[in-house]
Regions:
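Short beta-strand-loop-alpha-helix junction that forms the active-site gateway
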Residues: 89-125
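Acidic-and-aromatic substrate-binding clefts and catalytic sites of carbohydrate-active enzymes
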Residues: 81-87, 113-114, 150-157
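Basic, glycine-rich
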Residues: 132-170
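Active-site metal-binding core of divalent-cation-utilizing nuclease and nuclease-like domains
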Residues: 56, 67-69, 73-99
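Class I S-adenosyl-L-methionine
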Residues: 68-69, 124, 128
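A cross-domain feature marking catalytic cores of carbohydrate-active enzymes
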Residues: 79, 107, 149
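Solvent-exposed, charged helical/coil patches
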Residues: 2-76
């Protein structure tokens, strides 16, 4: 790729809303539910826009993405992670080139819903089985897992996100 200008300008082209392939609505198990935003079509759940211009599923994810972006961290939203033939899509993947640390960030916004909680517990067990351990435990050989969640009233504590990022990337 030949590019004139700062490398950071290329990041905007790595987000899903710039990818024609990622924007294809090709779920084999249920019909797509596209919505139109500014003349472009997105899957129904991706309705919140971050400061970086990507579409995410919740306002809490917007806050997290904007914090990552403000710090200049190179992150991906819902990047495919395949280990031993099983694929997961962490909410955020942050690769810190300076430290070599890979952080998989999951935000749990609906733990009060029993089916959501069960899926999350299964996903957490999968992470543990594949040596992606919570950052509070020092992480694992394949990366560190950061888990945040909404408050019981549905809110999110932005200051807590800031403090967490200070501990992880300072």
């Amino acid at each position: 790729i030949l590019h004139q200008g700062p490398r950071a300008d290329l990041r905007k082209y790595s987000s899903d809303d710039r990818s024609e392939t990622a924007r294809r609505l090709t779920n084999l198990f249920q019909p797509p539910k596209p919505i139109e935003i500014e003349g472009r079509f997105f899957e129904e759940g991706l309705i919140h826009r971050t400061a970086r211009g990507e579409m995410v599923r919740s306002k809490s994810e917007v806050i997290i993405a904007d914090h990552l972006h403000t710090r200049g961290l190179d992150y991906s939203y819902e990047r495919k992670l395949t280990i031993d033939g099983t694929t997961k899509y962490p909410d955020f993947t942050v690769e810190d080139m300076e430290s070599g640390l890979t952080v998989y960030w999951e935000h749990c916004g609906m733990l009060h819903v029993p089916s959501y909680r069960r899926r999350w517990e299964d996903k957490l067990a999968w992470y543990r089985a594949h040596d992606i351990l919570p950052h509070e435990e020092g992480g694992g050989d394949r990366g560190a897992l950061v888990v945040t969640q909404d408050e019981t009233n549905g809110g999110i504590d932005s200051e807590r996100i800031t403090l967490l990022l200070d501990r992880l990337f300072s």
